[in-house]
Amino acid sequence: MEVENRPNTYDFSKRDKLLSNRFYEENSLQDETDDGGERWCLICGDRASGLHYGIISCEGCKGFFKRSICNKRIYRCNRDKNCQMSRKQRNRCQYCRLQKCLQMGMNRKAIREDGMPGGRNKMIGPVHISLEEIERLMSGQEFKEGSDLSDSWSHGYSNHSSPGNSLSEGGQSLSFSSSRSVSCRDECISPQLTHTFLMCKYPLPPPTGSILKTQTHTLTGQILADEDLTPLTTPMLIEDGYSVTQSELLALLCGIADELLFRQIVWLKRLPFFTDLSIKDCTRLLGSSWHQLILLSSITVHSAQILGELANVTHHYTPSSHTLQRFGEDAMEVMESLNFLFRKFHQLNISNEEYSCLKTITLLNQETTGLCNTSMLKQLSERYWTLCRELTERLHPQRPKRFSDIITCLTEIRHTSGKMMSIPLEQLPLLFKAVLYSCTTNQNPWLPKSSTSRT
């Protein structure tokens, strides 16, 4: 596409001036304050919220460091591994951000082993680690050795509560990060979903109840038959040379969302357990999960159309300078999350059967108040979790961690879709243009670089 000849079509670094906040010196670990008594993050210069993992830092860098270590993420720098860190630039290079965290003394041993909020030991201070150890962490070598050790425990707990967001397949690494705070993620991941997610690493108890006795292959066939896997009918074709306006692209995005939502309603009514649930329960479940279902559909069965036809339409949209300036940090984080999800699901290559199971799991695992038949919903939830795991193990016996990778993606979908709901409508055209441009060109930082890298 023509867009590939414009390497910096979206140079977000130009939309903000550099911060004027006073940064700490690279080797200073003291709790310094300015005349007003405020403290600044050692990593990015944002206002610090306290002592986190041994050093003074902000909530964003605290959460980023925790996710990077707990999820064993591996990043790449497209430049010289010396990118500037500031509050508004910290999201642009996760490699340099994590490297700065380690250089400034953030202590990974202060992270709780269960991965939950709260330091493991408030008295643990900053640490100094060698350049060799930093390189081992940044390259993922230390994570790999730790993973090999934990794999030798047949049923033992690993050092982290959730599978990593780094996926290695065919010698290529995929990673994800954003600067959202831990508290934001805690709000988006319900206790019910977190509990079930943790349970998925270990054998679930066998399902009970007459409604759960359907054979696995029969049940899989039933929910697959309920799916409408045909291409989207919303027109996404455009003539060459036509300039798409912001309102036109927004109308198209709304049209696609409307069609996907309608398909979810039809799908729900076809599910084998639909008649066993009250209309009230079905309405509440769909009302709390529709945005997750739409996102899941977009990045799996409809990804070819989204990355093809829709990406071509967004290519003909040119945002104004005003729109670029108003593209906030929340939108940047969503963009990063969507990039990750598109890439990871592409590598996972989810089958239609797995997709059907994941949709059902997403529908049933909602922390919704006012449900009538909670006991049946719990049984159904356990049944479809087990079904999905059995299906994944049968289709991919050589990849025992595949199910955990998939469930990690569901958690990310839950968070990202919720975050998208807070993005102003007028920012959505630019958001999708940036995401689809990144996913369809080698601008994506997770794509392997063959010879040269763009800056």
Curated annotation (Swiss-Prot):
NR LBD domain segment(s): 215-446
GO MF entries: estrogen response element binding; hormone binding; nuclear receptor activity; protein homodimerization activity; sequence-specific DNA binding; zinc ion binding
Cross-referenced CDD domains: NR_DBD_GCNF_like, NR_LBD_DHR4_like
Secretion signal, residue range per the UniProt entry: none
NR C4-type zinc finger segments: 41-61, 77-96
Origin superkingdom: Eukaryota
Compositional bias ranges of the Polar residues kind: 149-165
Cellular compartments per GO CC: chromatin; cytoplasm; nucleus
Region entry Disordered, spans: 145-173
InterPro entries: NHR-like_dom_sf, Nucl_hrmn_rcpt_lig-bd, Nuclear_hormone_rcpt_NR3, Nuclear_hrmn_rcpt, Znf_hrmn_rcpt, Znf_NHR/GATA
Residue ranges of the annotated DNA-binding region, renumbered to this chain: 38-113
BP GO terms, sorted: animal organ development; anterior/posterior pattern specification; cell migration; midbrain-hindbrain boundary development; neurogenesis; regulation of transcription by RNA polymerase II; response to lipid
Keyword terms, alphabetized: DNA-binding, Metal-binding, Nucleus, Receptor, Transcription, Transcription regulation, Zinc, Zinc-finger
Keyword presence, Cell membrane: no
Cell location: Nucleus
Family: Belongs to the nuclear hormone receptor family. NR6 subfamily.
The protein's role, per its UniProt record: Probable orphan nuclear receptor. Binds to a response element containing repeats of the motif 5'-AGGTCA-3'.
Subunit details: Homodimer.
Annotated protein name in UniProt: Nuclear receptor subfamily 6 group A member 1-B
Organism: Danio rerio (Zebrafish)
Chain's gene name: nr6a1b
